[in-house]
Curated annotation (Swiss-Prot):
One of its GO terms (biological process) is regulation of DNA-templated transcription elongation. Participates in transcription elongation, termination and antitermination. Gene3D superfamilies: 2.30.30.30, NusG, N-terminal domain. It comes from Helicobacter pylori (strain J99 / ATCC 700824) (Campylobacter pylori J99). Residues 125-149 form the KOW domain. This is Transcription termination/antitermination protein NusG. Belongs to the NusG family. InterPro entries: KOW (IPR005824), NGN (IPR047050), NGN-like_dom (IPR006645), NGN_dom_sf (IPR036735), NusG-like (IPR043425), Rib_uL2_dom2 (IPR014722), Transcrpt_antiterm_NusG (IPR001062), Transcrpt_antiterm_NusG_bac_CS (IPR015869). It holds the Pfam family NusG. One of its GO terms (cellular component) is cytosol.
């Protein structure tokens, strides 16, 4: 019976583990027992200091690969022994199938890919520090954010008066 399982991998090795499982299936002629292998990802926008943007792919569940497989002890041990595979998720060192609700949530999250999100998120009311431009080293409060244009509308307090400014994401940093 085909069930979904979660495999824990070394973080950052999800794609190489997926490829290794695909190769294992092809080499041992067990493709009919492995129905699907997924590494859920999302697109993010990374903005460099020079305001150059690039879309990058980021794992939604770092360190995990999900597999729909007809699993027996032999196949479990073959997958378990692949490089960069830590373990199957389960109880008492035995793999436990994921519930329909869990895998449904994962697949829904994966299929509802929206426009790429910025790597750094700002929220209304959040206090940030301006790191570039005429207001460098000032702290400001986020009033609005424009994801599409990667701009923020901030309120900066200058000489006791609140002044609205518009600034690029790359010109501010979060205060931790």
């Amino acid at each position: 019976m085909m069930d979904w399982y979660a495999i824990q991998t070394y973080s950052g090795s999800e794609q190489s583990v997926k490829k290794a499982i695909e190769n294992l299936a092809n080499d041992h002629d067990i493709r009919d027992r492995i129905q699907e292998i997924i590494v859920p990802t999302e697109d993010i926008i990374e903005v460099s200091k020079k305001s150059k943007t690039k879309v990058m792919e980021r794992s939604l569940y770092p360190g995990y690969v999900f597999i729909k497989v007809d699993l027996d002890t032999v196949l479990w041990h073959k997958i378990q022994s692949l490089p960069r595979v830590s373990r199957f998720i389960g109880e008492n060192k035995k793999p436990t199938p994921l519930s329909e609700a869990d895998i449904g949530h994962i697949l829904e999250k994966m299929n509802n890919r929206a426009a790429p999100k910025p790597k750094i998120f700002f929220e209304q009311g959040e206090v940030v520090r301006v790191v570039e431009g005429p207001f460098a080293n000032f702290t400001a409060t986020v009033e609005e954010y424009d994801v599409e244009h990667r701009k923020l509308k901030l309120n900066v307090s200058i000489f006791g008066r609140t002044t609205p400014i518009e600034i690029l994401y790359s010109q501010v940093e979060k205060i931790i």
